[in-house]
Design a protein with these regions (language model features):
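Short beta-strand-to-coil "C-cap" segments at the C-terminal boundary of structured domains/repeats
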Residues: 303, 370-374
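Bacterial N-terminal signal peptides
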Residues: 13-25
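Primarily a LysM-type cell-wall glycan-binding module
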Residues: 319-343, 367
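Short alpha-helix capping/helix-loop boundary micro-motifs
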Residues: 354-358
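Non-catalytic terminal accessory segments
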Residues: 3-7, 11, 22, 31-51, ...
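Acidic, metal/ion-coordinating pockets
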Residues: 32-320, 426-429, 433-440, 450, ...
Length: 488
């Protein structure tokens, strides 16, 4: 190796060493699927208006990716114009996966979920990546709370969170049952669920057959029915393909009865709607949206009692009204009444236009104001909710300067992919980014051999400057480096 190449190689290593130290609606399916909610042997109240359940899974901090949270907020608002019965749920892995999560230990994502207005959420395995004390703190800050029937305290044998939540839509009662994957032990880290002596404090109703999980879910479904639920919607971070089969959503449905539909997550699959027979032979709908807000899930319990599911890949823009020209005699309260329906909303107008308004009592005729809560067509041409978009941009502004710091430079793309096929290879074969991360661990820890977990390398680095943001994208997890000493 020439001296110049050695210097370049060492520069790349130092870049990752520095990072280590710093871290210590267009429907996709127009019809979807529709099933009868009758035939389970139960008399149930049919809704007087459609019940719309919007759902997300595996967002992984993708706040602006694809539809984005601001697009989701807009779509939720659009659905509320069609029916008063709208509920928004998340099936897990929302708060981890990008720098915004890493730098705030998940806090910014909880703030954004509260802004969008979630009504129900289930912990995914990556919700635990910030360790249990922080996760429980975040759970207390999430307005809707987390729900899970099988995440249990081993000391009491009881669920840590409420196992289900009942919603009333007129005379119709719908129970949402939360289910965590028992894979959380291995897909997160066993140490997160133990005390300092290595004793397990928490469990997920895991066993070698799946029966413990099925039994707990069935108990919860039966309890919700006894409490008056007309419909049971399971929200599970379970997955379908590539995960432990006995804990898959398919197996859970097949081993239980009483669930009317299952909203899934964990395996990042795009499943508009598939049908699986339950223990009684009844067809049950399973659906999943993919990842990073590629789609919004829309499930509808219709006025004839049937259940329909579809995926929305694009949010339509409806009557965007971004600017308002101040007229003679206008005041913030008068504009708020005219444009937003209430004099009291003048404070929202003021907050949205602070850069323009120096005195809320004095408005200059002809000045252009933004009406909050209106539709905005953003730079990518996507329709988003203005107020939510502004809120997210305010959060991003708080940490963007830190992320722009340049740590190094690369003449080559550093990749997790097989260059011949373009497929992700880092868990199965050698890649230059995998080699670099292993060398970085070896050097910073003073070891003879460096090992890097391929599953923990989550992004590529393009040719050119390497920023702190790049390294956090590669290493989004709060992992700790370890040294093992062994005799020869």
């Amino acid at each position: 190796m020439t001296n110049q190449k050695k210097r370049r190689f060492l520069s790349l290593l130092l870049t990752l060493l520095t990072a280590c130290s710093l871290i210590a609606g267009t429907p996709l399916t127009a019809a979807g699927a529709q099933i009868s909610a009758r035939g389970s042997g139960n008399e149930r109240a049919i809704p007087s208006q459609d019940i719309v359940i919007l759902y997300t899974n595996d967002v992984h901090c993708g706040i602006d990716d694809n539809i984005g949270y601001a697009g989701l907020a807009l779509y939720k608002r659009q659905m509320k114009r069609e029916t008063p019965y709208v509920t928004l749920v998340d099936a897990g892995d929302a708060i981890q996966g990008a720098p915004i999560g890493t730098l705030s230990d998940g806090g910014y994502l909880i703030d954004i979920m509260n802004k969008v207005g979630y009504d129900f959420a289930v912990p995914g395995n990556h919700e635990f990546d910030y360790r249990m004390p922080r996760f429980l703190e975040l759970a207390g800050k999430l307005d809707c709370g987390y729900y899970s029937c099988n995440f249990t305290s081993l000391a009491t044998g009881k669920p840590v969170f409420a196992p289900y939540k009942m919603f009333s839509y007129g005379d119709t009662q719908v129970a949402f049952v939360g289910i965590c994957t028992p894979e959380s032990f291995t897909k997160s880290s066993p140490a997160y669920f133990q005390d300092g002596a290595g004793n397990y404090l928490y469990g997920f109703c895991e066993d070698n057959t799946g029966e413990a999980l099925y039994s707990r879910i069935q108990e919860t479904v039966d309890a919700a029915r006894a409490a008056g639920a007309d419909y049971i919607i399971a929200v599970g971070h379970l997955g379908e393909n590539g995960i432990t089969e006995r804990w898959s959503s398919d197996r859970v449905v097949a081993a239980t009865s009483g669930i009317d539909a299952l909203i899934d997550g964990h395996s990042h699959e795009t499943v508009p709607a598939k049908m699986v027979k339950n223990k009684e032979g009844r067809e049950i709908l399973i659906t999943q949206t993919g990842t990073k807000l590629e789609n919004i899930g829309k499930m509808t319990i219709k006025t004839d009692g049937t259940i329909k599911a579809e995926l929305v890949a694009q949010v339509p823009g409806d009557s965007p009204q971004v600017e308002y020209t101040v007229r003679k005699g206008d005041s913030l309260s008068r504009i708020a009444k005219r444009e937003l329906g209430s004099y009291d909303r003048w404070t929202e107008l003021y907050a949205a236009n602070r850069s323009l308004i120096t005195d809320p009592d004095l408005l200059r005729t002809g000045m252009k104001l933004v009406i909050p809560g209106s539709v905005l067509i953003n730079a990518e041409g996507k329709a988003v909710d203005y107020a939510t978009d502004a809120y997210i941009k305010g959060i991003e502004k708080q940490y963007q300067e830190t992320l722009k710091v340049v740590l190094g430079y690369s003449d080559y793309n550093l990749t997790t992919l097989n260059p011949a096929t373009g497929q992700r290879a880092i868990r199965n074969a050698e890649t230059n980014l995998g080699d670099l991360t292993a060398d970085a661990y070896r050097m910073v820890l003073g070891a003879d051999i460096g090992l890097s977990n391929g599953g923990g390398i989550r992004a590529d680095i393009k040719t050119g400057n390497i920023t702190y943001n790049d390294t956090l994208a590669v290493f989004p997890y709060g992992n700790m480096g370890c040294v093992v000493e062994a005799t020869g």
